[in-house]
A protein has these predicted regions:
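Active-site phosphate-binding strand-loop segment of PLP-dependent enzymes
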Residues: 146, 152-219
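Helix C-cap/helix->beta junction micro-motif
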Residues: 28, 141, 201-202
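N-terminal small-domain helix-loop-helix segment of the aminotransferase-like
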Residues: 11-105, 112
């Protein structure tokens, strides 16, 4: 019996090793669950509580009312309008509902964006360290993630100077995260503007992973 042939672009993607850590900690947690020192999880980006009651009630109500069919490909219009309103009230940013697409999480959104915007061989500049899956999304689009080392003094974020120094004829854009996983740091707003201005001047794209935006607190 012959083995199924896996596409080369899939073979380039490395395992997500944090899940192995999660398995090991879950096993240890079961051992100490009823002891005087239960485990506090700090290993994976998932809270130890469930969805708020309002969310649970809304989900149950949608099922009860039969709202379980296909939506528009871009998501529920009413939800897109509410998200547009949230950007207006939270950031005073005018983001029209027509520019909003609902996906099954940030990973799906980033992967779709990469598939839509990155050609084979395109380079995407990213800080190192950064969330491993983000560079895999670039690889899935047959692009090349260029990891630029960062330091604690730089808050593990890219600067405009570093982006300009690393930019080549093959560069397509940057993929940033703020707040970042795994470092938890945010990029300074003015630095982000400088990066975007430079990338835009080169005809490039600025992708930003903001999955932890709601966990950002001003001093």
């Amino acid at each position: 019996m012959s083995h199924m042939r896996i596409a080369r672009r899939a073979q380039r993607i490395e395992p997500f090793y944090v899940m192995e850590v999660a398995k090991a900690t879950a096993s240890l947690a079961r051992q100490v669950a009823h002891s005087a020192q239960p485990m506090i999880f700090l290993n994976i980006g998932e809270p130890d509580f469930t969805a708020p009651p309002l969310v649970q009630q809304a989900a149950a109500r949608a099922i009860h009312d039969g709202n379980t069919q296909y939506t528009q490909a871009t998501g529920l219009q009413s939800l897109r309008e509410r998200i547009s309103h949230w950007y207006t009230t939270r950031f005073q940013a005018d983001v029209a509902p027509s520019r909003i697409v609902i996906t099954a999480g940030a990973s799906a959104a980033l992967q779709l964006a990469c598939l839509a915007l990155i050609e084979a061989g395109d380079e995407i500049l990213m800080p190192d360290p950064s969330y491993p899956c983000n560079r895999h999304f670039v690889s899935a689009a047959e692009g090349n993630a260029v990891l630029i080392p960062t330091t604690s003094e730089e808050r593990f974020q890219l600067s405009s100077a570093k982006v300009q120094a690393a930019w080549t004829a093959a560069s397509r854009g940057v993929l940033l995260a703020s707040p970042s996983n795994p470092t938890g740091t945010s990029i300074a707003p003015q630095e982000l503007k400088r990066i975007h201005k430079f990338v835009h001047s080169r005809g490039g794209i600025t992708l930003i992973d903001e999955i932890y935006l709601g966990l950002s607190y001003d001093p």
